[in-house]
């Protein structure tokens, strides 16, 4: 049977707020629901269900002309917190580092802060972008730029960096490395919905979690939740 699905962007926080306001049937989230959001749902008498539908690797990206090929988690933390400000400090050219980030309502912003910055704050002068496409465009046009995007959005316009969390073993952001867990910056992606609307959202959820749906997820550059 056919179904009409309307998708609106804005970030995880926007989606969950829309779900709590009952202006959407499903909130797509790139982070787990926050305690404060759970409390709002409880106060409104809403019973929210969480369904992991895929996993996503976050790629650290720079301008294609940047000679740097890899960074450690600590180096990334120092860059995004403003402690390292010149590419020369991490083996690159003598060029100022321009940091691009997602806006605070983004689940991607939250996850990168949690996984890479260990919940420390981003530098105040980082440039917040409203969407992944804006980060890709800005990084592709700025020689000293660095940012982060979901693996599915990686394009030849930008260069990805290999990352190491132990300072010894580096892995490039590829689907294969994300699946075999050698690449460290990987997060679950969720669908949230109100249980009272289960009958409305069930057909879409059933399809997403089916073999056909998970095949589309993998072909789109994401990691399926079900092993083939």
Task: Please describe what each predicted stretch is.
Residues 1-228:
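Exported/periplasmic ABC-transporter solute-binding proteins
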